[in-house]
Amino acid sequence: QFNGETYHLFSKQFCQEMSKSLDERIWKPELSIIEGEEVIPMRDTELYLKRRKKRFMRDIRLCLRRIAYASSVDLDTHLQWQRWMTRTRAMDEHLKDLFSNGISTPDGGKFGGKGFRSTWQEGVVGCATSLNRAIDLPPENRHQADIIAPMIRDVGLALAVGQTPLEIFAAQMGKSGSYMDGGNLDSGGRDLHIGNWEKGVLPPTAPLPIASATATGVALAAKLLRINRFHLAPVGEGCSSNGEFWEAMNLAGARGLPIAFMIQNNQIALDTFTVGQSGAETFGDKGHAMGIPSWTIDGSDPLQFHASTAASREYALDGGGPTLIHVETMRGCGHAHHHDDLYLGSVTGNPPGYVGRELLSYWAEKDPLPNHRDYCLSIGANEKQLISMEEEEQAIVDAARKKMEEMPWPEGNTVTKGVTSRHDAETHTEQFERFEKEGGEILSGPLKDGDLAIEFSNASNSSTYGRAIQNAMVALAERHGDDIVFMGEDMEVAGAFGMNSSLKAKGHSGKLLDMPLSESIIINSATGAALGGMRPVAEIQFGGFAALAMNALVNNAAQLRWRWGADVPLTIRIPLGAKTRSGPFHANMIESWFVNDPGLTIVFPSNPQDAYDLLIESHELNDPV
């Protein structure tokens, strides 16, 4: 039997002895024949084995820390998990009922909401007791709170870190008072997902990897700003097939960011079985390719969620970097409410459901609510205590549903409010009125084709585009100090076209950040860094490469203010056009791709003075430009 102190001493001694034993094995006579041999270029036997040993010992230490955290949990913590899981299951039952029966709308119809449930996956609430929750901190310190980026099914985790049942109901039913109001009173219902940024819950998105990629950027901001903050990014196994998720893990591994990724293997992603998603033995194996320690846990046990999150948090905040937690689980319902009949089978037997009964039976027996309830009883809880808690939670959720139903529906004309900090979007009516006023003709510019309003100089000391942009970037670096970062490909040596030489000459090398060659993670992580307290300047090296960041630009950065009123102070520089002399894929004229997106501000300078002014002014906006 160990206590905390004796277990710590045992763990320390165990690791020392194991490390010593591994060192001794390297020099056994049977290995002497490969001593000094080059295993791979520039890596001999000794160096190769030392690195392998270092990673192995890291995994052993993390395993011992998980055991330590699991062993330190008391009855009160188990009862808290049971309460949160009970609340989640009660929410699930209401959400299914709402979807099936709907509630009345002003036009005389019915609406049933979005509908994602957590059945059999409520154990994820265990993560919350390992986190520094925003709701437990004074308002002035909430920027230091840990951040979660839940998947759509993690209702229990959102509730456990502080979202209320009313928030979840209002979001999934699209009521005017929901959090998804673009920061405008009574303008909710724009997005039917969970989330509350002020409580440390990054709202998920339908393009699944956006949330984890954005959370990676928030983690990047924490590291650059030296904020002691941890980040947790759960996804499903289907999302783990997406390139943007891999790019997020790759950046986190390369930069040692304080984040834990969590792949929840639901067994079936919508209707695609795991054999169609990955050839790896486990989804945890995906971490090793990124240099990230990973392990597998049972998703029906909140204790394993708690211990794994606690160990990951400790490792990350001690400077170890990211981890990957693989969760074996199964959802006891369809992908969404509408999917239940196809997935499980209709009550009428038609359709019969395609999921094997044996698979369903196995996971039904692992249902965390009754199993963990029995465990609570076995360690000292009493039946009356649990019944009282269950009645309380049911009453809380019932009351929240009633209050949600009393909330007004949003007015349709509120949907145009706040697409950027500067303006609202036009309605179709307003667009048609403008077309009629303009007579349907293309407006003429102030100059005829080929005319110039500015006389360009050939003098050796005249300003150029490049010089103007360099001067503007130096001015921004000096104005914003530690809050600014210039991020993109090949930034730290000189940057494309040597544009970063002035920043380096002025002593701002520390503000330059080389990114992996992935336009998507450049923009997604820059968006996250903007949410995390920075004012990034992101660079896409050539115009055509912006296509690789389309999802990040239009489905992420452009929509955050409109969805929930977020400030996203992000400036993106993209050189394009014939002057780059770079041909196809590089010089593409891309303005038409983005100018019709209401959440993006597009500026296109035509001379050096405008290049300077627009870069300075753009960066003062709290919007993506």
PLM region spans:
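A glycine-rich helix N-cap at a beta->alpha junction
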Residues: I168-G182, G253-I263, K511-D514, A557-L576, ...
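Conserved acidic/glycine
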Residues: Q1-G126, S130, N141, C333-G507
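Short hydrophobic alpha-helices that are characteristic scaffold elements of the AMP-binding
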Residues: A530-L531
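Glycine/charged-rich beta-loop-alpha catalytic/anionic-binding loops adjacent to active sites
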Residues: T105-F111, G189-T205, R229-L232, M290-S294, ...
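Glycine-rich ThDP/TPP pyrophosphate-binding loop and its adjacent helix/strand module
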Residues: Q1, W197-A400, E405-E406, V595-V625
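Cofactor-binding active-site loop characterized by glycine-rich and histidine/acidic residues
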Residues: P106-R255, F273-A280, G284, A289-G291, ...
